[in-house]
């Protein structure tokens, strides 16, 4: 355990930020999972709706520093392609 006051404060801040980031990351994963589940069932309307809901959540994670911009872009691009392919086949 740290003896210096500033180090103790940093530990407290880190714990709070870690918990906050973990919650944000979990939320992003939940939104992505909803899109993937809708794709798996083959329901293109539900998949599109879930994808539209997931987009701002991923962007928010980038803004907050939870995800890197390229990671979010890659995830959105791949999900978009899968939703588009599902819509085209329906």
UniProtKB/Swiss-Prot annotation:
Pfam families: Ribosomal_S20p (PF01649)
Alphabetical keyword list: Ribonucleoprotein, Ribosomal protein, RNA-binding, rRNA-binding
GO biological processes: translation
GO cellular component: cytosol; small ribosomal subunit
This protein's record includes keyword RNA-binding: yes
Entry annotated with the keyword rRNA-binding: yes
Domain of life from the UniProt record: Bacteria
GO molecular function, one term: small ribosomal subunit rRNA binding
Chain coiled-coil ranges: none
Function of the molecule: Binds directly to 16S ribosomal RNA.
Protein family (similarity comment): Belongs to the bacterial ribosomal protein bS20 family.
Protein name (Swiss-Prot/TrEMBL): Small ribosomal subunit protein bS20
Organism: Acidiphilium cryptum (strain JF-5)
